[in-house]
Amino acid sequence: MHRVKQKRNSVLVAVPILILCGWGALFLLSRWFAYDPARNLALSLPGMDGGPSGSDRAVTNEVQVNLAGKLEKFDGVPSSLPGSWPRFRGADFDNICKADVKLADRWPESGPKVLWSVTLGEGHAAPTVLNGCVYLFDYDEAKRADALRCFSLADGKEIWRRSYTLPAKRNHGLSRTIPAVTEDCIVTVGPRCHVSCVETATGNFRWGIDLQKEYGTTEPLWFTGQCPLIDNGLAILAPGGSDALMMAVDCKTGAVVWKTPNPKGWKMSHSSILPLTLHGEKMYVYAAVGGMTGVSPAGKVLWEIPWSASVIAPSPVPVAGNKIFITAGYGAGSLMVQIDKTADGFSAKEISRTGPQDWLACEQQTPILYDGLLYGIMPKDGGALKQQFVCYDPAGGEPVWSSGKTHRFGLGPFFMADGKFFILDDDGTLTMLAVSRTGYESLAQYKVLDGQDAWGPIALAGTRMLLRDSTRMVCLEMGAEK
């Protein structure tokens, strides 16, 4: 009798447990069927892979940075070789070399001749060239320092280096700007919004500005990409700060000559300032995060137009008929603006606003305008034309031509010289093609760099071409055989 009762009690205990287990299994099964595996996935963008957060980026606001730093001298000497590339996008701000140089139409099987190469800190900063010297704003990861480096164009030997200590975490590279150089001075903008001016011949320090500390600049995502402008002895900068959208600084003294108010709170973008003359008046055109504006040589806003792109890397491009074209990636597309002038002043009118699948758009590099046509590389979200090199008539409509599905490119640079386009792909493959109004005509292709993220703009001085990937710069001989 006791055994029967004990067995009955065991059954009474087991049944509820089995019922609970069954309900639990059904609950877990229902959760499994209801689970959306993509629900917690986030869009993966450059800089979101463990790079500095906003609070990390702001840490330098609490650190006193000695921008004078130190100057080191080496055994390199300036070259007597001809040619110059004095600033971002070249002498005329259009990424077209107009010097009378003859470049090879074909390359040997071994590719263009490598004259020299140097190791760099990880980044996308590109060189400028003047008087046989190559200037590049680098980041020394071992010493944790921004460094303006001067090399000989002849052999790549370092001549001098001006550096200052600055903590920074890798965020898809570090330095990514291009110095502006004149016979008198060099102006740089560092990844954390530090501006410096040094003497060109000696590297001696003149002055420096911490845009975050002094003007309330918000450091852009993935560090600063704005390249400085030197114009008539003034450094023209766009802090996008609390009280200075744009400003001019005397290169000799470091004195602020004028500041443009920023009542709308537009922020610094990766775009660079373009000096332009429209309707007979000079102005500085800049695409900030918030909108595009034209500012007079005295710092007065002449016109402005809102634009909601959140990440802007390309610079404005002037188009015939007093128009300006601006484009950006991450779905922003492009904007074409008409600038008019009456007795009451300037005005800006939107002509077209297009998505990346609708018309020409570029994510990282600035399109080239040549002979009335626009050339560029479509972004990944460019629809059927994604990552193709394309040619468009600024008047609108379908593309004049594209490189086709078998010729796609990444975020690397492209520029024009001697009737040819040169396109550097992400993996260091250099493509040369004929400049044409009728179609894509490839002339040669060779992998000239072994690294990755070859995004830094190309420079050409004489027949020597300077290119880089994320950690190495090479100098190639591109001249035609005589």
Predicted regions and their residues:
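Loop/turn-rich, solvent-exposed surfaces of beta-rich toroidal or solenoidal domains
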Residues: 332, 358-435
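Residue position within the beta-strands of beta-propeller blades
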Residues: 134-136, 188, 237, 286, ...
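Short coil/turn segments that connect the beta-strands within blades of beta-propeller domains
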Residues: 131-132, 183-184, 232-233, 280-282, ...
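Extracytoplasmic beta-rich repeat domains
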Residues: 115-128, 143-145, 161-180, 208-230, ...
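A short loop-to-beta-strand structural motif that recurs across blades of beta-propeller domains
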Residues: 147-149, 194-196, 245-247, 291-293, ...
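Short loop/turn segments immediately following the C-termini of beta-strands
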Residues: 90-93, 139-141, 191, 240-241, ...
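Blade-level signature of beta-propeller repeat domains, shared across WD40, Kelch, NHL, RCC1
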Residues: 332-334, 428-429, 451-482
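Aromatic (tryptophan-biased) beta-strands that constitute blades/sheets of beta-rich domains
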Residues: 5-16, 26-119, 135, 147-168, ...
